Design a protein with these regions (language model features):
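A short glycine-rich, Lys/Arg-flanked "PGG" loop and its adjoining helix->strand segment in the class I
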Residues: 129-141
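Conserved beta-strand signature within the Rossmann-like core of class I S-adenosyl-L-methionine
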Residues: 142-149
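A short acidic, Gly/Pro-enriched loop at the edge of an enzyme's catalytic core
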Residues: 103-111
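Conserved SAM-binding loop of SAM-dependent methyltransferases across substrates and taxa
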Residues: 53-65
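Conserved class I S-adenosyl-L-methionine
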Residues: 1-44
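Conserved SAM-binding strand-loop segment of SAM-dependent methyltransferases
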Residues: 86-100
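Conserved SAM/SAH-binding beta-strand->alpha-helix loop
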Residues: 73-75
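SAM-dependent methyltransferase
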Residues: 149-222
Length: 262
């Protein structure tokens, strides 16, 4: 079956079906990091840059947080607003970019988060630094930014493959993501995702291609040194085990950083 070329962010329901299963676990981890590394107190204000389908915006709102988020994709934001309305929950949502966002009004946040490698869409060092500085500028002193991304194995010579399968309401989605070996000079890696969607006896295949910026542990440390407003308080991985901190030393290929606002 030939694949239709389409941005998977323009199909938010299918995207959400794949990733929503991890939402409660991610929210549990965010709250655990808040308790361990943030200021004491009840849930406050939380910001999600690149909030996508709004799954974590809704989950955090349900847990008593005053939630806000932005995304660059209008289809994702429309989906997020719809799910919040259906749940009878409210949140501040707006369209913006990670490297240049501005929060409406003068809101300041206790917690911010950006998981599942979305940060790697920022393809230049300047944009990455700008994003971190802007997040720092809207965090209250002592607030935390939880940032998750896959690190790059520069010596790898073959493509990497990940596969997810999920179903909701009679819609069955299989997601296959392939990442090609990185170009260490350009610090880019090519990525392709294929979504196979089956519903009511019909099947559809769509494909999205893009590039990510690459990071080794050393490159990530160098980036963080350019934003002294944020201090690395802890490092974990995508198991989201709050009781198992790790070192950001290249010994593992995913990193969930807890950055504390000075």
């Amino acid at each position: 079956m030939p694949a239709e070329t389409r941005d998977w962010y323009d199909t938010p329901l299918q995207y959400d079906i794949i990733f929503d299963a991890d939402t409660p676990r991610e929210a549990d981890f965010l709250e655990a990091m808040w308790v361990e590394h943030g200021p004491s107190g009840p849930p406050g204000r939380v910001l999600e840059p690149a909030c996508g389908s709004g799954r974590l915006v809704l989950e955090m709102a349900r847990r008593g947080w005053s939630a806000a988020g932005f995304d660059g994709n209008a289809s994702m934001l429309e989906f997020a607003r719809g799910r919040l309305a259906a749940a009878g929950m409210g949140a501040l949502l707006w369209q913006d970019r990670m490297e240049s966002f501005r929060v409406p009004g003068r809101a300041r946040f206790d917690l911010a988060h950006c998981l599942v490698s979305t940060f790697k869409y920022l393809l230049t060092e300047d944009h990455a630094v700008s994003c971190l500085r802007r997040v720092a500028s809207v965090l209250k002193p002592g607030g935390i930014f939880v940032l998750g991304l896959h690190l790059t194995e520069y010596g790898r010579a073959t493509p990497d493959h990940e596969r997810w399968v999920a179903e909701r309401g009679g819609i069955h989605v299989t997601c296959n993501t392939r990442t090609w070996p990185a170009d260490p000079r350009a610090r880019l890696e090519a990525v392709r995702t294929r979504l196979r969607v089956r519903q009511g006896g019909r099947e559809h295949l769509q494909e999205t291609r893009w590039h990510f910026r690459t990071y080794s542990a050393a490159e990530l440390h160098r980036l963080l040194r350019q934003v002294p407003e944020l201090r690395l308080a802890a490092c974990h991985d995508f198991t989201y085990d709050a009781a198992a901190p790790l070192r950001l030393d290249g010994s593992h290929l995913d990193a969930v950083l807890v950055l504390r606002r000075r």
